[in-house]
């Protein structure tokens, strides 16, 4: 009897030791994982496949990629071929692009939904929010309505080549600035700085998005004279560009939106920037991308800008779309944003809302089909 108990204890201890050993091995694998494994990892079974299959297919890379860091997903071998062996010459497929544009327009009237206009809302009208409970509302004030354009800022606009510039750290050292600035229209995301990074990201800006939370994060809600001056000077640099302000995504933006409205009314006529305030556009945009098997809690700003660009651009080139913490060309570590301070740790907070790797894979597939040019290598 005693021998049986001892045997059971020994068995349990053995299982515990094996589990600890596997955990230690996985941690070591994660730390020592070479970045090239991201590209050479074969297509393994789906997450629901038998665990032993994944061990057999390649324990180190699969365990580290699949279970320890969800931001790193196996990238297809075709990406390896294009970036590391023989960069292919991208060819624009106009027929496919026009077909996609038509598909998008069936779900989203981009011109109409690009911005609210004076004629599309009335004073006292209650606006709801795309990503908040229906109980939250924003009342259209006289000041807010006075800031709306008379017609959509992109009405009857057409541009040959457009650049949509994301904020990924892959732009660091890319020398893509001149190429971006040659575009006929440049979309930028989240009021990203350009001057100190112009060699990599360019200076030209025709449209930049402005999430109201930026006012809290970088301009202290305009609480001091210095904060207000800094914001004014930043806006002045935009000259006649469009400032696209998605004020109706979250109810938490309401107070900041009112602060913005007061500021723009106060400085009416002093700035050349064009204001655009989209209404509830996301329900339409989400519907299109859901048909492409992309349905995160929230789409990224970058893919939203691609959606808008499809309506006014004859050809779209993407820069700064890379959601991983290393450069695919040099394998050096990258910051999450190109403008992050040196030494800033790569963040994966976006996982709470976005599906950036899935978005990237879709965009890369579109690149291969000639729908859009996705720049991942250095430009010079």
Swiss-Prot record:
**Membrane topology term:** Single-pass type II membrane protein
| Lumenal face of the membrane | 34-380
| Keywords of this entry | Disulfide bond, Glycoprotein, Glycosyltransferase, Golgi apparatus, Membrane, Signal-anchor, Transferase, Transmembrane, Transmembrane helix
Entry's Gene3D superfamilies? Answer: Glycosyl transferase family 29
- Which domain of life does the UniProt lineage start with? Eukaryota
What's the catalysed reaction? a ganglioside GM3 (d18:1(4E)) + CMP-N-acetyl-beta-neuraminate = a ganglioside GD3 (d18:1(4E)) + CMP + H(+); a ganglioside GM3 + CMP-N-acetyl-beta-neuraminate = a ganglioside GD3 + CMP + H(+); an N-acetyl-alpha-neuraminyl-(2->3)-beta-D-galactosyl derivative + CMP-N-acetyl-beta-neuraminate = an N-acetyl-alpha-neuraminyl-(2->8)-N-acetyl-alpha-neuraminyl-(2->3)-beta-D-galactosyl derivative + CMP + H(+); an N-acetyl-alpha-neuraminyl-(2->3)-beta-D-galactosyl-(1->4)-N-acetyl-beta-D-glucosaminyl derivative + CMP-N-acetyl-beta-neuraminate = an alpha-Neu5Ac-(2->8)-alpha-Neu5Ac-(2->3)-beta-D-Gal-(1->4)-beta-D-GlcNAc derivative + CMP + H(+)
Where is carbohydrate linked to this protein?
A: 93, 113, 206
Q: What is its EC number?
A: 2.4.3.-, 2.4.3.8
- Protein location: Golgi apparatus membrane
Q: Where does CMP-N-acetyl-beta-neuraminate bind?
A: 167, 190, 300-302, 322, 336-337
Q: Which GO terms describe its biological process?
A: ganglioside biosynthetic process; N-glycan processing; oligosaccharide metabolic process; protein glycosylation; sialylation
Q: What residues make up the catalytic site? A: 354 (proton donor/acceptor)
Q: What is its main location?
A: Golgi
Q: In which tissues is it expressed?
A: Expressed in neurons in brain with higher expression in the striatum than in the hippocampus, cortex, and cerebellum (at protein level). Expressed in testes.
- Cytoplasmic topology ranges: 1-17
Residues passing through the membrane, by range: 18-33
- What pathway does this protein act in? Protein modification; protein glycosylation
What's one GO MF term for it? Answer: alpha-N-acetylneuraminate alpha-2,8-sialyltransferase activity
Function of the protein = Catalyzes the transfer of sialic acid from a CMP-linked sialic acid donor onto a terminal alpha-2,3-, alpha-2,6-, or alpha-2,8-linked sialic acid of an acceptor, such as N-linked oligosaccharides of glycoproteins and glycolipids through alpha-2,8-linkages. Forms oligosialic and polysialic acid on various sialylated N-acetyllactosamine oligosaccharides of glycoproteins, including FETUB N-glycans, a2-HS-glycoprotein (AHSG) and alpha 2,3-sialylated glycosphingolipids, such as alpha 2,3-sialylparagloboside and ganglioside GM3 and to a lesser extent NCAM1 N-glycans.
| Record family assignment | Belongs to the glycosyltransferase 29 family.
Q: How does it assemble?
A: Homodimer.
Q: What is this protein called?
A: Alpha-N-acetylneuraminate alpha-2,8-sialyltransferase ST8SIA3
Which species is this UniProt entry from? Mus musculus
Lineage here is:
Eukaryota, Metazoa, Chordata, Craniata, Vertebrata
């Amino acid at each position: 009897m005693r021998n049986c108990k001892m045997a059971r204890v020994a068995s349990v201890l053995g299982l515990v030791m094996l589990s600890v050993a596997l955990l230690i091995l996985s941690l070591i694998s994660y730390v020592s994982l070479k970045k090239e494994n991201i590209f050479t990892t074969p297509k393994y079974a789906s997450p629901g496949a038998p665990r032993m299959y994944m061990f057999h297919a390649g324990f180190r890379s699969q365990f580290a990629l699949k279970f320890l860091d969800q931001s790193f997903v196996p990238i297809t071998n075709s990406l390896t071929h294009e970036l590391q062996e023989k960069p292919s010459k991208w060819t624009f497929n106009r027929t496919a692009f026009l077909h996609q544009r038509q598909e998008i327009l069936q779900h989203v009237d981009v011109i109409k939904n690009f911005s609210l206009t004076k004629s599309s809302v009335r004073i006292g009208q209650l606006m709801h929010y795309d990503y908040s409970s229906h109980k939250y509302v924003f009342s259209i004030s006289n000041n807010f309505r006075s800031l709306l354009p008379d017609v959509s800022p992109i009405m009857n606009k057409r541009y040959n080549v457009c650049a949509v510039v994301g904020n990924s750290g892959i732009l660091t050292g890319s020398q893509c600035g001149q190429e971006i600035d040659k575009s006929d229209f440049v979309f930028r995301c989240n009021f990203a700085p350009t001057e100190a990074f112009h060699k990599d990201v360019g200076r030209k800006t025709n449209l930049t998005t402005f999430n109201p939370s930026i006012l809290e994060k970088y301009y202290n809600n305009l609480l001091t004279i210095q904060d207000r001056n800094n914001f004014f000077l930043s806006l002045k640099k935009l000259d006649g560009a469009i400032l696209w302000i998605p004020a109706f995504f979250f109810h938490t933006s309401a107070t900041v939106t009112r602060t913005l409205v007061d500021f723009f009314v106060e400085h009416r006529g002093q700035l050349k920037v064009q204001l655009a305030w989209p209404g509830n556009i996301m329900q339409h945009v989400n519907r299109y991308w859901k048909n492409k098997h992309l349905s995160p809690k929230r789409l990224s700003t970058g893919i939203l800008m691609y959606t808008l660009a499809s309506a006014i651009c004859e050809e779209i080139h993407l820069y700064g779309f890379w959601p991983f913490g290393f450069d695919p060309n040099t394998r050096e570590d990258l910051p999450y944003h190109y403008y992050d301070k040196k030494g800033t740790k790569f963040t994966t907070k976006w996982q709470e809302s976005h599906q950036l790797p899935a978005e990237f894979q879709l965009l890369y597939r579109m690149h291969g089909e000639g729908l859009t040019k996705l720049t991942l290598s250095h430009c010079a």
